[in-house]
Amino acid sequence: MKLSKTISALFLSLVLMVGSFGTANAAKRLHAAIADWTGGIITCEVAVAILEREMGYKIKQTVFPSGTGLWEAIAAGELDFACESWPSYAEADDVMFNEDLIYDGKVVKSYKGDGTVDLLGTTGIIGMSDYWIPKYAADELGIKTWRDLNKHKAKFATIETGGKGRLIGCPVAGWNCHDQKRLDLLGIDFQADELGTEAAAIAEAKAAYMRKEPFLLYLWSPHWFFGEFDMVGVQLPDYATCEGDTFTEANNWKTCGTKGWPATGWDKDYTMNYGNPATFAKAEHADAKAFFERMKFENIDPVSYTHLTLPTIR
């Protein structure tokens, strides 16, 4: 699936569903962050397309890596908004949000931070993460869950990993995935390989798949990769609260044994858009704030991107 075709299809379906927006007489301006993974790029490109083509905005876009630095840039007003934050991998949301995260009318979490960043509503995309192997490898080796990986680690080993298996890991350090620590805590004798970008990790996995080699891949859902390649999750253990302790660097990685997934205590990621409070408090941007609050993707299935439903904003 090519990204440009995906964005075009999503934009077309969105416009057909949305109806008409009021267009501003003079262009209003916002500054958006370009995400460093495919899903975030798609979410923001669709938002930017609607804001510009239907609502009269001019949007400046800047490539900005995920992580605490992005949140700080938004709080400082250097950027106005960013799209599709995954709370399992955001360590600044607890510090900077001061409002409820609501999904389907239910409060998922009440944030008690300083309010220096605004939660602009959920995207509708519910994410999850796991480690995945090709179905052909799972069938051949009899791997059912993560507990079976060590028995077959030699099949996943490389010259670089020696006697350990290799995980094509979470690609970007700023995403706070902490794969190696998680592998070690679970007793999985694999070495996490951080390749720097989503594109590099996917290219590595695609090449191994085409060669019909076993490989273990960190990946999140929804993701287009699952629409092209038959993969099986190893069912990493669900998160469980551990006497107030969470699997974070701040408390030296305290854990409940196998119950430390994902990193900050979310069994599902209710993804959200976020922005600068002063920007979206301005009357001239009230329509943009309403747009983000109503913008919703829908997960048709757990592995692929979907259509958008957006109420008309008047």
Sequence positions of predicted segments:
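Short, well-ordered beta-strand elements
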Residues: A27-G39, I59-T62, K164-I168
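N-terminal segment of the mature folded domain
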Residues: G67-W132
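Short, polar/charged alpha-helical segment
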Residues: G39-Y57, R182-L183
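A bilobed periplasmic-binding-protein/Venus flytrap-type ligand-binding module shared by bacterial periplasmic
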Residues: M128-D139, D269-E284
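A conserved helix-loop-strand patch within extracytoplasmic ligand-binding domains
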Residues: G105-L167
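Ligand-binding pocket segment of bilobal, Venus flytrap-like solute-binding proteins
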Residues: W71-W86, R166-D245
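Conserved small/polar residues in nucleotide/adenosyl-binding loops
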Residues: T306-T312
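C-terminal segment of classical bacterial N-terminal signal peptides
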Residues: L16-A24
